[in-house]
């Protein structure tokens, strides 16, 4: 029965297909293989999109939607783009998270019966970009696969991640707990995520385009074997990945998908890196955001730490900088090696020094991405010429590095990495023209002298006229016919024309081609051979050039790993040179590391803020086992957040391997950096500002260790005063007694400044400011002890709060202070040392009621009184003063 149904379905499908034109049958077959992808169908000089694809493309790309004819009774909606401009349209689609299947003509229109044969040669998706026109120079694009592992009860126990930078071939794996997924995706920032239907809900919203792939692609055993096949190894033990489970399953799905989009093997994926949380200083999403490492809180690219540090001369160096900032190593060994290299670069002699080195680096091409395209056989002619010119410049660059490398082992390693693969430069020099055309189809790509046949075809095409003149001269001399002519027309091609009176002198090798009234036209074997070549010379030259170019690409494939080694060395050298330039220009110093717990910064400066202002006030920061928590008080805008952030940034820069903005700095081990700074709600997640604040605080309290650096800014401010104060006090105590981490704790709760009485490991510091008239001057200097005022009204005045509001606030503040002073049990003043209050005796009379004249006076705003009103008020106050509180109450 099932067989009958299948046969009926196939017959119905065949009948439906037969109603379409042959070309539309071909298109619909290809479209059925890529149902969720926009199909760019090559027709002559255009890529056409049909039906629903055309409607979507017209909307997204602002194309004209047309309708031409019908197929199977359905109007054919069309939209097209010129083939030479397709990359710019693909770039727009990728930004919208769309994918496109590029369908090319692979058959010969002259010999095809019916539609020209076509097939999809590549699929462009958000995570599989390799073309230079589709990529940002200074950031990587990652394709990530996610596989959820389950325990025996069917509960998610771990998550395996595999992510690939297809443009470079860098493959990484990780396995983590389910609650760590959001932080991992925030760090990796994949452009596209591959997941099976049952795991898509695990992916947090807004983390990249999600592509569904079959669940069987994530099979762990198959994934492990596929990784071994890809890396050409028998076991993954050498990469530390053999014992992984879900990560290997994710890698298998990723490799299947990536190879399918490219339509070929991934020859440049030759190694992998297993990332372990213990390798790097932990930076959660909140910390990355608050420290503005690569993006400001407003979502812009600058001013950030990345934009300040990125003076790299190559795109490779800029991308490596971004990676280093998000992956600071915990072990200080790597940072110390980088500091040593920076010192050697700064101390180098002028002829081989920093400026000379950076000048040479500016001539270097993006070897990393060119190598990726080379491995995928999609490198263009100018990619190869750029690679050739870079390899030609490497010997001089290596000499400069070698002169400096004796003082830094890291530079010695890089100098060795800069040796081009043997034979690669020679091949590129011989094969590729000095200034090749942008595309192979335009010709002029292969250098003269590389191939004799191509040179001859070019000569024929370019020097056809000269050949005919030379042949005519030779034939006149050979035959003695002075008026012999060699000519050409489109009907008969090339011929030798002899007048009737001279035909008796025609040699035996002349063959008659055409008889005219007064002349005979002949062809010779030499001319026939030339004709065959000349008439197709240009076409044949382009075909020969294409074949030779493909041969060059194939010949370069064995050099992929060598090119990757060179690219890695160039990127690191460029970044170290950029660090050295920043250190020299901005007066930064090499930090020191110690195994003892502590952070000591002498005259530290916020690197980004300092670059934005004319003068920056440097401050010290000292944290050690006897001084683990600094309670920071002071006015708003006084610099509390800047001081905290600069401490974290200086520590991060030190471990990344950069010099730091300070007079001196010394760091003990740091395993994580936490921040609880700023106020923002999560409307999409249904969380209030206070809930976000408490969630971040909970993560810190649960995860911080004695080696963690914690920044807490005004914790507890999102609720009532007493709730907030109680929470802030309890959190600070917990950080001191349980976490015992390095902590910078900024607060406006002055009651917290009593914490050092109970915990000697806490200390008070404040950001100084002085009043000037009704205004305030921020000194931005960190001084010992608590602040004595909040300066809230002065800051509000600076912010432009209207004067009547400021006056009303000042009156109400005086009223509140008066009430507080009159209370039997006074509340602690916000920014004054707590008074010593004697216990009242039992027979002590109650506190006096404030005098009505004083209360009335406090209600006044003298600036709003007219002369007559002031006089009336004076009489009123006189009466109140004489009557007293008791009379006023009556």
UniProtKB/Swiss-Prot annotation:
GO BP term, example: mismatch repair
Organism: Burkholderia pseudomallei (strain 1710b)
Family according to the record: Belongs to the DNA mismatch repair MutS family.
Signal peptide: none
Recorded superkingdom: Bacteria
Binding-site residues for ATP, renumbered to this chain: 634-641
Name of the protein in its database record: DNA mismatch repair protein MutS
Pfam families with a match to the protein in the record: MutS_I, MutS_II, MutS_III, MutS_IV, MutS_V
Function: This protein is involved in the repair of mismatches in DNA. It is possible that it carries out the mismatch recognition step. This protein has a weak ATPase activity.
Keyword Iron (UniProt): no
Assigned GO CC terms: cytosol
Key words, A-Z: ATP-binding, DNA damage, DNA repair, DNA-binding, Nucleotide-binding
MF terms (GO), sorted A to Z: ATP binding; ATP-dependent DNA damage sensor activity; damaged DNA binding; mismatched DNA binding
SUPFAM superfamilies listed in its UniProt record: DNA repair protein MutS, domain I, DNA repair protein MutS, domain II, DNA repair protein MutS, domain III, P-loop containing nucleoside triphosphate hydrolases
